[in-house]
């Protein structure tokens, strides 16, 4: 059998060449040392000047992308030190450090808990702000409520309960402020005083009283200034079985609260009953009028203010304008009263 020595020598040469290349590749591959660490490819490291960190090894042949905790789709390639690869059982976290796989999962759970806690805190703060917005302390005055409010106090209507309904302004001139409608009270945030009453009921020019009694100029003008039983009934309404043709200045709704019965008992509930009052049904007076007589309100002082004609249908005629008083230069006696209040 003839063997071509030339071909054989060529084959031996090729075999020796590939064997040498194979040994070089084996020498270049990293070898695993102690647990979790790798021997470094010192030859290539010296050539490139790259030093891998803890839990990393050098891999000069790396061509694929490396996984990390928050990117498992191998889309982010070569974003860290080139050719440094996490050791087996390790993975890069968000801080670019190689950590154990279980530590990576814990890190993700902590992130989720932090985000959830932050969202809950934001929600709780918004709820707390909403509660503060509608808290009782943020309301300066209690607004007037419907009839239900009166029922809250078992039907007792006095200074205390009215203050709860309408609100009590500081330095209030009247302990028992007049009963106003819900809309009127709300216009002034529950403050019922000389200024707000003038805004509600109107203030005539050169008024002798800073607080005009509870009648608007329009109502007085409707009847050419004549204020008597007939005109008052037209303005305020006349309940059936009324004990007084000239009922106090109440609205229809207020009168209906007591089934149209207006007497000593119901008026005391509405207006309050002052001590040593000469009359259980005290008319609505202004602060100025009361001060004229040092706070003494009795038959004599009221006659001086309102006048008392003989056979008068009302002993204390309310609703007198300054104009009537001014006609006589402020002199109110039997003669002037007879001209004002026709006997």
Swiss-Prot record:
One of its GO terms (biological process) is symbiont-mediated suppression of host innate immune response. Residues 1-28 form the signal peptide. InterPro entries: Ser_inhib-like_sf (IPR036084), TIL_dom (IPR002919). Gene3D superfamilies: Laminin (2.10.25.10). Keywords: Host-virus interaction, Inhibition of host innate immune response by virus, Signal, Viral immunoevasion. Residues 52-104 form the TIL domain. Counteracts the host humoral immune response by inhibiting the processing and the amidolytic activity of host PAP1 and PAP3. Thereby, melanization of host hemolymph, normally producing several reactive intermediates toxic for viruses, is deregulated and proper immune response cannot occur. Interacts with host PAP1, PAP3 and SPH2. Belongs to the polydnaviridae EGF-like motif protein family. This is Protease inhibitor Egf1.5a.
